[in-house]
Amino acid sequence: MRPQLSDYQHVSSGKVRDIYEVDDNTLLMVVTDRISAYDFALEPAIPDKGRVLTATTMFFFDAIDFPNHLAGPIDDARIPEEVLGRAIIVKKLNMLPFECVARGYLTGSGLKEYNANGTVCGIELPEGLVEASRLPEPIFTPATKAEQGDHDENVSFERVVQDLGQERAEQLRDETLRIYSAAAKIAEEKGIILADTKFEFGLDSEGNLVLGDEVLTPDSSRYWPADTYAEGIVQPSFDKQYVRNWLTSEESGWDVESETQPPVLPDDIVAATRLRYIEAYERLSGKRFIDFIGG
């Protein structure tokens, strides 16, 4: 008999995840179907999104050689039936206060900063780069973790050193880039470009660095089809960039600089986003989403 979600104490909720305490050492992390963009929670939710993100994270936890926060299998008996397939049991960690971003291509906030001053997070880049340009080598571009409702802020590597010390900062940078490169190779073999991604790390009780949160999902990464890749244009994508693109289109009527709540997503955008997330998982993993637990 599985426990009920109400049997666990609710600890916190973010834009997408709800956290519950299982015991002194472990948490239940529930991935909802909520979606956010530009630091706003959007309406409506994307059906099956929580399961897709969980399935993708589980695939990469298995594929990537680095300690992670998993504390049980996807069908762990401690997971309530009502969230089976979109929840995992995880170890409690002391989470570090930075999002660790790896970029292999120039787009998004990185492109905006580059166009302004030729750098990304203080890293000087060659002249003449445009939307979707491949960088000479992947770069580490950390960001502060914003509270819900606030904006994440890109920061320099020196800021990470200042807060965490040289050794820990270098470890974060080196492991972020190593994991990104390994994942990019997996994606490349499946005809997909991993343009960028972000990781969150924490420390376990012995001070070891551990991967937490989600990894390499369509929420935390930009995935582009390799067969249509071209510099200088916004790429079609298997991630929530599709939602971002609609929000900044004339059709939505929303001004990203307005600081106002974005409009409700149309049904066709919701449906297309769901299919993109599922396609990303199926192409990357080689598995059918319909076969993943909880369906």
Curated annotation (Swiss-Prot):
* Protein's GO biological process: 'de novo' IMP biosynthetic process
| Stated name of the protein | Phosphoribosylaminoimidazole-succinocarboxamide synthase
Give the family, as the similarity comment puts it.
Belongs to the SAICAR synthetase family.
User: In Gene Ontology terms, what is one molecular function of this protein?
Assistant: phosphoribosylaminoimidazolesuccinocarboxamide synthase activity
Gene3D superfamilies assigned to the protein according to its UniProt record, in alphabetical order: ATP-grasp fold, B domain (3.30.470.20), Phosphorylase Kinase, domain 1 (3.30.200.20)
Keywords tagged on the record:
ATP-binding, Ligase, Nucleotide-binding, Purine biosynthesis
**EC annotation from Swiss-Prot or TrEMBL:** 6.3.2.6
- Name the chemical reaction catalysed here: 5-amino-1-(5-phospho-D-ribosyl)imidazole-4-carboxylate + L-aspartate + ATP = (2S)-2-[5-amino-1-(5-phospho-beta-D-ribosyl)imidazole-4-carboxamido]succinate + ADP + phosphate + 2 H(+)
Taxonomic superkingdom? Bacteria
InterPro entries with a match to the protein in the record: SAICAR_synt/ADE2_N, SAICAR_synth, SAICAR_synthetase_CS
What does UniProt give as GO cellular component? cytoplasm
Copy the pathway line from the protein's UniProt record: Purine metabolism; IMP biosynthesis via de novo pathway; 5-amino-1-(5-phospho-D-ribosyl)imidazole-4-carboxamide from 5-amino-1-(5-phospho-D-ribosyl)imidazole-4-carboxylate: step 1/2
Supply the enzyme class, top level: ligase
